[in-house]
Design a protein with these regions (language model features):
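Single-residue signature of alpha-solenoid repeat helices
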Residues: 52, 86-87, 119, 155, ...
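Register position in tetratricopeptide repeats
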Residues: 45, 79-80, 112, 148, ...
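Start-of-helix register in tetratricopeptide repeats
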Residues: 34, 68, 101, 134-137, ...
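Structural marker of alpha-solenoid helical repeat scaffolds
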Residues: 62, 93-97, 129-131, 164-165, ...
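Canonical positions in the second alpha-helix
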Residues: 59, 92-94, 126, 158-162, ...
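TPR/TPR-like (Sel1-like) alpha-helical repeat modules
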Residues: 95-100, 128-129, 164, 298, ...
Length: 471
């Protein structure tokens, strides 16, 4: 991938100007395959997908067999259109299949097709052809690919083949693996060391922010994001990390500001529009949320992994606007993708009915979900949350009591809601019991649900002591 500094260089901008001038005048001009691929990537990162494809396809037509434009088209088909067959069609046209970009793309096609063993065997065969000087780089690239597909064990196995374990690239992959395994403290220590050694490296600050966010140290995560933003105000990952942090703290207006900044830069897919829509729903601005979610739906490719979330959030917005039938239709669209939990989505239909004053219709959907799921705890939990959200505190209290008697030992959700039920029902001792449990087991949920009852800067771990000292 060409880096941003090259796209901002005088050399590239002059080439881009010449290309655009020739396009506007409709005259032929010579640009080599590498340049056309660079222009395509520049347009793509700027959200100008049609212009990007036009430039890349010019390269494909003018330079048959040239790697850069063909790999660009292959990656576009694989990662954005979710079409591995078309991606492979472009890849097969490359003359030199030994190019690293071709090797990596072929492996990714196999991974998308869920052929993990074939991909690993192929990559190990390619490793045998690597020069000693390039071996570590190849291994680290493969580990990175596996991390991108959440194949943590594969990434760790490949990382063990690296000889130079002191390099920053090795340490970065080691840190990412730690985060992927849930070892957030270890990951944070690795990225802290990396930012100490490379204080102006935004990617390390971003990874540090992620490790702190996953450890529920939201304020530290925001601070790390701010360092990254200070280095590069247009760093998409840093802006997104800060937005996520502010959202987690319930600072929705501030989160909206940073999601909007992210969205203005990240134009190649619908992600930013989704985040803005969700935030606007939390700000009780459903009409505005609907506009952004509909734009996200328009931007999404037919098989986008984001479609279920888009349909669900659109249904939320429509329900808030009292458009029950339209909301239910969107839930059906989410079910039709085959990628959502049908029982939980059926509960969501019940929530829409309950939110709009139709308790009998809601009950029918809830019972349908319970029967179909054979009383699965996650389904019962979602029904209890819906009942709670709609103000039926006595019923929610009973449902949470029933739920907590049947959940597995590692269950962490809903204790914050139960503590508030107890508070509203004047069950003081139970309120304190569930408050303590909520803050110990799920501090992020506690912050979201209980935060308004405590000082803004107080960490959830301190809620119980704060309350007991007030008595």
């Amino acid at each position: 991938m060409t880096n941003d500094s090259y796209f901002n260089s005088e050399e590239f901008l002059q080439t881009l100007h010449s290309y655009e001038e020739a396009e506007q005048e409709g005259r032929a001009a010579y640009f080599d395959s590498d340049t056309l691929a660079d222009i395509a990537e520049y347009y793509y990162t700027d959200g100008r997908t049609n212009d990007a494809l036009n430039a890349a396809l010019k390269g494909v037509d003018m330079f048959p067999g040239a790697m850069p434009p063909l790999v660009f088209m292959g990656r576009y088909e694989l990662l954005k259109q979710n079409n591995p067959q078309k991606a492979e069609w472009y890849l097969e046209q490359v003359d030199d299949q030994s190019e690293p970009e071709c090797v990596y793309l072929r492996a990714e096609i196999m991974l998308v097709e869920n052929k993990k063993d074939e991909a690993d065997e192929f990559l190990r065969q390619q490793l045998e052809w690597q020069d000693d000087a390039e071996r570590d780089n190849f291994v680290l690239d493969v580990a990175d690919i596996y991390l991108d597909y959440d194949l943590i064990d594969h990434a760790q196995e490949w990382l063990s083949m690296v000889e130079d374990t002191q390099s920053t690239d090795y340490q970065e992959v080691l840190g990412r693996i730690a985060l992927g395994k849930g070892e957030y403290q270890q990951g944070e220590e690795i990225f802290k060391k990396l930012v100490e050694d490379n204080p102006f490296a935004s990617p390390y600050w971003n990874q540090l922010a992620s490790s702190q966010f996953l450890s529920n140290r939201i304020k530290d995560s925001i601070e790390s994001s701010e360092y990254s933003i200070a280095i590069n105000p247009n760093d998409e990952e840093a802006l997104l990390n800060k937005a996520n942090g502010m959202f987690s703290l319930g600072e929705y207006e501030e989160a909206l500001t940073y999601y909007t900044r992210f969205n203005n830069l990240h134009k190649d897919d619908e992600t930013g529009e989704i985040f803005i829509g969700i935030t606007l729903i939390n700000l009780d601005r459903p009409a505005e949320a609907l506009q952004h979610l509909q734009k996200a739906e328009e931007m999404a490719v037919p098989r986008s992994i984001n479609l279920v979330e888009i349909y669900q959030e659109t249904a939320f917005a429509l329900s808030r606007l009292g458009r029950v039938d339209d909301a239910l239709a969107y839930v059906n669209k989410a079910i039709a993708t085959g990628n959502g939990n049908e029982d939980e989505l059926t509960v969501f239909k019940g929530h829409i009915q309950l939110e709009n004053g139709n308790p009998l219709a809601a009950q029918n959907y809830f019972l349908e979900a319970v029967r179909h799921s054979k009383s699965a705890p996650n389904v019962y939990f979602r029904i209890a949350i819906s009942v709670y959200d709609n103000g039926y505190m006595q019923l929610a209290y009973r449902m949470f009591h029933t739920l907590f008697q049947s959940v597995p030992a590692d269950w962490k959700d809903g204790y914050s809601h139960m503590s508030l039920c107890c508070k509203h029902l004047n069950k003081e001792s139970e309120f304190l019991y569930f408050l303590r449990k909520a803050c110990e087991l799920n501090p992020m949920e506690a912050k979201t649900i209980l935060g308004e009852y405590f000082p803004k800067d107080l960490d959830p771990e301190s809620y119980y002591n704060y309350i007991t000292k007030q008595k």
